[in-house]
């Protein structure tokens, strides 16, 4: 797996902390991972997060690539199968013909690029596909295009259990982050947290590649810290 990280290091431990938070709710089975803009690390995050869940005994995980144009998941994991989501929705292929096994997880590539991704993602067939996978797997992770680029993520967010945002801490503009949350809230998305990439805290004197914040809707859009990292000595 191209996105594999070394065992027992800080990055791997960060993913395990996120996994712990996400497994608190037994009904949190279908999870969208997206970002506000490009190059914030959402695809790397979702690949490693899916792998982290796949490490658990007797847990079935599937990772779905719904970023039809970029196909980031397929590229990162080295999947050459051209068939996937779009082919299933259009009735050209069956589900078991498209699923690929990558280490401990199953992967469903995006397939061919549809003329209208919004129509595909909003279709009854697509929603039924996600529901079918929800019944077959313990966890379903979905990668999508950035929210400020296409409306695709906002569509998917309406029929998954939860949405996780990935933000590059040094690059994300606060106004863009606020706009992203407003877009998701307008469609009734359940924003369950934020993964903050390449996060440095001078206050706690540590550097972390990934920090996780739960989203507290009662605090008017403020992210509250869920996990405290160990300080470097």
Language model region names:
Residues 2-12, 16, 20-27, 35-40, ...:
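P-loop/Walker-type NTP enzyme "switch/lid" segment
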Residues 32, 107-109, 141, 164-166:
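Structural motif
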Residues 53:
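Aromatic pocket-lining residues of Rossmann-like dinucleotide-binding sites
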Residues 68-70, 94, 112-115, 147-148, ...:
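Conserved nucleotide-binding/hydrolysis micro-motifs of P-loop NTPases
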Residues 132-135, 147-170:
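Inter-motif core of Ras-like GTPase G domains
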Residues 141-142, 196:
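Hydrophobic residues in beta-strands of the RecA-like P-loop NTPase core, especially within AAA+ ATPase
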Residues 178-233:
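Hydrophobic micro-sites
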């Amino acid at each position: 797996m191209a996105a594999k990280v070394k065992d027992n290091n800080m990055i791997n431990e960060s993913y395990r902390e996120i996994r712990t938070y996400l497994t608190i709710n037994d009904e949190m089975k279908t999870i969208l991972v997206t970002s506000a803009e490009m190059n914030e690390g959402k695809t790397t995050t979702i690949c490693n997060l899916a792998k982290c869940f796949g490490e658990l005994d007797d847990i079935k995980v599937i990772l779905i690539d719904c970023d039809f144009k970029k196909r980031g998941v397929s590229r990162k994991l080295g999947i050459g199968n051209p068939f996937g989501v779009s082919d299933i929705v259009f009735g050209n292929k069956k589900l078991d013909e498209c699923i690929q096994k990558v280490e401990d997880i199953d992967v469903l590539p995006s397939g061919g690029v549809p003329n209208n991704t919004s129509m595909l993602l909003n279709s009854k067939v697509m929603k039924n596909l996600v529901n079918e996978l929800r019944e077959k797997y313990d966890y379903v992770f979905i990668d999508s295009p950035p929210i400020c680029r296409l409306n695709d993520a906002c569509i998917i967010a309406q029929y998954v259990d939860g949405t996780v945002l990935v933000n590059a801490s040094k690059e994300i503009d606060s106004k863009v982050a606020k706009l992203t949350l407003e877009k998701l809230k307008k469609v009734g998305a359940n924003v369950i947290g934020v993964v903050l990439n390449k996060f440095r805290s001078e206050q706690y004197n540590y550097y972390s590649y990934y920090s996780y914040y739960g989203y507290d809707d009662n605090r008017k859009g403020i992210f509250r810290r869920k996990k405290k990292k160990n300080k470097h000595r």
